[in-house]
Amino acid sequence: MSDADRQRYEGLLEEMARRDAPVVIRRKTDSRLQGFIDSALRVLTLGGQDRYLTDYVTTLGTTIWVPATWEDWSYRARYKILRHELVHVQQFERFTWPGMVLIYGFFPLPAGLAWGRAMLEWEAYAVTLEVEAELDGLAAAADPGLHDEIVRRFTGPDYGWMWPFEGWVRMRIAETLTAISRRPPMP
């Protein structure tokens, strides 16, 4: 664990707290709603999404819900995930709660062709790639293992098989990497 990672993470937490609508972090295990969502996802994905409470971070409005083990994760990992999740906070602000429920959950379908969810998640995964490049270099963002993981999430049960088009996901990854590689280096 590096001191720079801790400072970066703590700085982001301070930014989150200073917002007009502060962003808060809560444990999923402290919420009945999160337990209900976990149970519903297990049923809807035929057991495919069985790690919602233990491995996944979820944003609803200005609350970022984390697993009970969140504090055990490295500062670097938490920072990367929060950057991804803050995209979802901005989406809630842009589209409102009813809009997010409709776009994320039902447009045009809840599974298989969940274009709305795929677009919202892609916006956040593009930031995931940007943060990888910022912190660990372009080679880390270009890692085929990371790309395979992103593809698996889009096409598998993690998000309810939201977008079955692997080629589309890989094309978006490639476009994002090209855009990142053309940016001037950060100081």
Show where each model-derived region lies.
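A metal-dependent hydrolase signature that marks the N-terminal structural subdomain at the beginning
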Residues: 1-48, 178-179, 187
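Pan-zinc metallopeptidase signature
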Residues: 140-187
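Compositionally biased, charge-rich terminal segments
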Residues: 12-35, 83-97, 135, 144-157
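An active-site-proximal "capping" alpha-helix that borders the catalytic cofactor pocket
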Residues: 119-132
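Post-HEXXH active-site segment of zinc metalloproteases
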Residues: 60, 73-80, 91-122, 144
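Well-ordered, non-membrane alpha-helical segments in soluble/globular domains
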Residues: 7, 80-82
